Amino acid sequence: MNIYDQLQAVEDRYEELGELLSDPDVVSDTRRFMELSKEEASNRDTVIAYREYKQVLQNIVDAEEMIKESGGDADLEEMAKQELKDAKAEKEEYEEKLKILLLPKDPNDDKNIILEIRGAAGGDEAALFAGDLLTMYQKYAEAQGWRFEVMEASMNGVGGFKEVVAMVSGQSVYSKLKYESGAHRVQRVPVTESQGRVHTSTATVLVMPEVEEVEYDIDPKDLRVDIYHASGAGGQNVNKVATAVRIVHLPTNIKVEMQEERTQQKNREKAMKIIRARVADHFAQIAQDEQDAERKSTIGTGDRSERIRTYNFPQNRVTDHRIGLTLQKLDTILSGKLDEVMDALVLYDQTQKLEELNK
């Protein structure tokens, strides 16, 4: 099937989906309605671009016809030739754009995410850097018009984070932030360093797509739920009523503790969101590990402990090791202006996938 047949098939399917989504039987089936809605949304940009491309092709035909019928009118012929030139340039641009749009889509790209950041090697300095990363992602999310909610946080004594979990909601969140999973290294002089020596510390980031209950069922028998009293600073109980929740997924021993909310029900709901994402991610990672060759050909899906980026404060430098990108804009990037980095990662990923398709 050539590219034009593929595009026509996508448009035909898009129109079929529009009809299905107005079918009462589909509307009443929540799971099916969600699946079809997501499929329609994932094809929308391709269909819009294809329809615009067809208009450009028609513009070429019209311009060629105008040249033939100019009847010696030099001004008309010149105008038609310019229109033809512009339309042919547009045609090439659309063909490149459509090739990328036809690349296999990540089914999670449109999803919200669970973002986990942990201070790793480097003690207090690593925890402080985890806080810097949290602020960076918060500001980036704000610039994108996304909602950013801290769900769980474990702080250390100097204002850093041993671990922080956040929910980021909005349009195509996973498609942008999925490349952030991995080890982030910082090189700087800690505030506690009296000799002015540069120290190296690490924080790890994990990005998981949100998993809706209708998408991924966890057998209640596989869960152990403990209810206990929330504790404050120093470990004292701060609630007379037990509102904190610990959920353990027994087959994997994945556990989540939640005490941020005032009610047991809200803590339980948040804990279930996180554990559903972690369990789904756990099994997805196992499946991915079985496809090592494919995984290594793309970015953002490799070893979670892999060092992906270095933030060098003395040189105001950020280096993304996966694509060899170095920017002397550390202060700008940590303030949430991540577009240049994100765009480069997306472009690299698309280029790799195009090369795979052309082999």
UniProtKB/Swiss-Prot annotation:
It comes from the Bacteria. GO terms for cellular component: cytoplasm. The keyword Cytoplasm applies. Keywords: Cytoplasm, Methylation, Protein biosynthesis. Peptide chain release factor 1 directs the termination of translation in response to the peptide chain termination codons UAG and UAA. PANTHER family: LD18447P. The modification N5-methylglutamine is found at residue 236. It is found in: Cytoplasm. SMART domains: PCRF (SM00937). SUPFAM superfamilies: Release factor (SSF75620). One of its GO terms (molecular function) is translation release factor activity, codon specific. Methylated by PrmC. Methylation increases the termination efficiency of RF1. Belongs to the prokaryotic/mitochondrial release factor family. This is Peptide chain release factor 1. InterPro entries: PCRF, Pep_chain_release_fac_I, Pep_chain_release_fac_I_sf, Prokaryotic/Mito_RF, RF-1. It holds the Pfam family PCRF. NCBIfam families: prfA, PRK00591.1.
